[in-house]
Amino acid sequence: MGAGTGAGTGAAGALGAAVAALYTATLPPTLPGGDAGELITAAYELGVAHPPGYPLFTLLAKLATGLLPVGSPAYRVNLLCGLLGAAAASLLFYTVFRLSGSYAGGILAAGVFSFSRLTWQWSIAAEVFSLNNLFVGLLMALTAHFEEASTAKERSKISKLGAFCCGLSLCNQHTIVLYIACIVPWVLSRLFRKTELSLGHLLKLGLCFLAGLLPYLYLPASSYLNRARWTWGDQTTFQGFLTHFLREEYGTFNLAKSETGSSMREMLVFQLAQMKSELSLPVLALALVACVSTALPTKQQKSPVIWLFAGMLCLYSLFFAWRANLDITKPLFLGVVERFWLQSGAVVAVLAGLGLATLASVGSAVLEGSRALPWLEWLSALALVSSQVWANYSACDQSNNYVVDKFARNLLSSMPTGAVILLRGDLPGNALRYVHYCEGMRPDITLVDQEMMTYEWYLPKLAKHLPGVYFPGNRWNPVEGVLPDGTLVFNLHRFLKVFMKVTRPGKGAIRSGRGVHVTSWFLPTLCLTQESGFILQEISITGLKTTAVSSPLPGKLSPTRRCGKPGDAPLLPSNSRMKTAFFIFDLAETASVNAEVKSQLYTFAYTSYKEIVNSHPNHPVNWHKNYAIACERMLRLHRVDVDPEALVSETVKHFLLYTEKAEDDPQRQDILQAVKHLKKELQGLRKMKI
């Protein structure tokens, strides 16, 4: 309290530089996955990112891609985010130091937060979370500065700067509004008690807040100019702007659209477990010490700030647990949710730093003249921070991670000239958009997002940037026709002039006819080239032999990262091949072809399934079912080059493996009944050999 501001600022800068050095050493050199591809592309094209638009991040990323002289556009934005994360660490240090005067406490707060797995992972990727961490640190630092201010003039200046920063922070991630909702009443009440809150000052604070929101003018400006080859939404009207700003397409107060999530209690338990895992139990204990310390008379002067921070933490945790409508028992959804716990983790880290300073202060008062206590304080802080770095450096080191980049490049490079690619899903969509638009790869190819075609703004905004693609209506709809408002909608059948339906393995079919040659590369992506006739052999060869799906890629992905599906993340190449195998198998089931071609298709699918399943012991459970069905079909072909006993044995084995792990499959009893008959058939085959 009242510590030297200059010394604290210098120490904060030095600590930020150290964090920046470690972050830079572990940056991914290319596209990291998740939303990064879409955010970078929107910035590069000066378009609008997904709701709520993230105008501040978009503009900063555009500056980074244009001004930084190193690496690819993705690397430059990754570097920007790393530097923002380092700045957030400096602000956390400054907050603790300003309130307690403890260097060790500040280092503890900044270090344990910055080098936790979750913070590190999302601070070196081109995502909005490091900028949000920066604003969390900034608002807490300004709060501490306001509390320590000694004059009315200084408090007035800080409150105006804080109002501006509150508005500016909302130009990035809206979850910070819960912290603003705590800080603003607290600041106003402090000003009111000191008789420093006049109507004129309140008006000035409001104007400063509105000035912070000015980056949102970028959204209608970008939408009006409509020069970006990738953008989201139509913000040229006030209603369109509000739709985007309020995230109405996702659900304004929900994390996702049309999802049923875990219970509030389950969410809070997961969050507490995550805090313990990410920050360690001693850090949580120190945060609790800070809260308990408010009962000590010697700490009364900073008690209001500690209670404010604790209130921010509680409000955010409770509200987020209430509205985060995702099932966090699924690894991918847990990965989506846990990123939003970063905001609460920053507060816990600051409280822990204050708790360490409190213990040192109380210890000094009890053991007057002891020289061991300062050393013990420093040793505790450095030990906890070092343990974070030691535990997480290897897992967070993405300096050799080219997985998503190679995935996108191999896929695009293997496409035929002039292809039109229908995209579904974040991984293919974001990755292909980035390498195509930002790095200029394969300018002859056209990317069309199948899911985005369902939005009424997609064609009016982007059709002119898709030359050579004819859209027979205003937007895509499962049932074609004219809507009551006069909108002409078309379905995929009309768009492709073929009937096509692709769903998850075991649930769908794909069919084709003359006029368009359709190649299924993997489930969420289809490539179309204009040719006459349906060339089955080319589909088989292209779908399985292309480098896009068969070249081995280095695995550095976590099941909780949004660059793959739960459990599939380390298996991107083989998962793509599995989907192609499913396509070939399903074609054999449904296509009107002669017996010889049908036999070739079943054989090709069986061979592919066998190779993929045997090469990956830890694969998704549905692979067992798909492979077992393929074996059963091969058995019915009565081919002389395949041992029927081996086929039945494999069918039984993999059906049983599937039913052990997929207890919720409604067909489970039917599968077990089929296994009984197959076992009898296996016994008969073995008797025939005797």
Predicted region positions:
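Short hydrophobic/aromatic helix or loop-helix immediately within or flanking a transmembrane segment
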Residues: 42-71, 82-83, 90
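Aromatic- and kink-enriched transmembrane "portal" helix at the membrane-lumen/periplasm boundary
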Residues: 24-25, 46, 67-78, 85-88, ...
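Transmembrane-helix motifs of polytopic, lipid-linked glycan transferases
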Residues: 13, 79-100, 138-142, 353-354
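Transmembrane-helix signature of polytopic, membrane-embedded enzymes
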Residues: 6, 10, 17, 92-115, ...
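N-terminal membrane topogenic signal
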Residues: 1-15, 301-304
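ER/secretory pathway lumenal C-terminal domains and tails of membrane proteins involved
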Residues: 125-126, 133, 146-162, 166-420, ...
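Extracytoplasmic catalytic/substrate-binding loops of multi-pass membrane glycan-assembly enzymes
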Residues: 27-39, 49-61, 229-234, 399-403
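Alpha-helical transmembrane segments
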Residues: 9-23, 208-211, 311-316
